[in-house]
A protein has these predicted regions:
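N-terminal beta1-alpha1-beta2 submodule of the flavodoxin-like/Rossmannoid cofactor-binding fold
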Residues: 1-83, 89-104, 151, 159-177
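Short glycine-rich anion-binding loops that position phosphate/pyrophosphate groups of nucleotides
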Residues: 86-88, 121-122
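Short, histidine-centered active-site or binding-site loop motifs used for metal coordination
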Residues: 8-10, 118-121, 153-154
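Short active-site-adjacent structural elements
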Residues: 125-126, 156-159
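Short, glycine-/small-residue-rich phosphate/pyrophosphate-handling segment
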Residues: 93-94, 106-149
Length: 177
């Protein structure tokens, strides 16, 4: 059994990337894995202040918010799923905030099996920048394997992924972990 942490950065509870996260979770749980979805929008997470207080304080951020608990979950996870909608040709602000706030532990991110879930209102070509942002973060893990990627393109309206093959692919990817 693996410990799976899904970081969902969709601001919409019923947004396409969130729906795909739920499908991934369903597949992984049916395989017997322990899965936790953290919806960034539902957390109290402030922006990094770039004060380097965490570097002077043993990796503990000066901000007292929900990120401390999320970082503990992050470090315990065997599998990391990063899910984001594409906004203005990049990852969501919520995902960027999450990534920035991992700075206190960036030298101790650990080994992870990584999956991406990216949804976009336009074609697949605009997903490339978001993919670059996620890859830039993942490359800081001590050891990583990008084990799977799901792209849902041309899904502007919430819920459109339910009628596409990518919906089943998300379940299958979770089940394959």
């Amino acid at each position: 059994m693996k410990n799976i942490l899904i970081i969902s950065s969709s601001p919409r509870k019923k947004g396409n990337s969130q729906i795909l996260c739920e499908q991934f979770k369903k597949g992984a749980e049916e395989k017997g894995h322990q899965v936790k979805i953290v919806r960034i929008m539902e957390q109290n997470i402030g922006f990094c202040r770039a004060c380097d207080g965490c570097m002077r304080n043993g990796g503990i951020c000066v901000l007292k918010d929900d990120m401390a608990e999320i970082l503990k979950m992050f470090q315990k996870a065997d599998v990391l799923v990063l899910a984001t909608p594409v906004y203005f040709y990049g990852i969501s602000a919520q995902m960027k905030t999450f990534i920035d706030r991992t700075y206190p532990i960036w030298q101790h991110l650990g080994k992870k099996e990584v999956y991406y879930i990216i949804s976009a209102g336009l074609g697949e070509d605009i997903i490339e920048r978001s993919l670059g942002d996620l890859n830039g973060f993942v490359e800081h893990l001590e050891e990583y394997k990008i084990a799977g990627k799901i792209y849902a393109a041309n899904v502007m309206d919430a819920g459109l992924v339910k009628n596409q093959r990518v919906f089943q692919k998300a379940y299958d990817m979770g089940y394959s972990v």
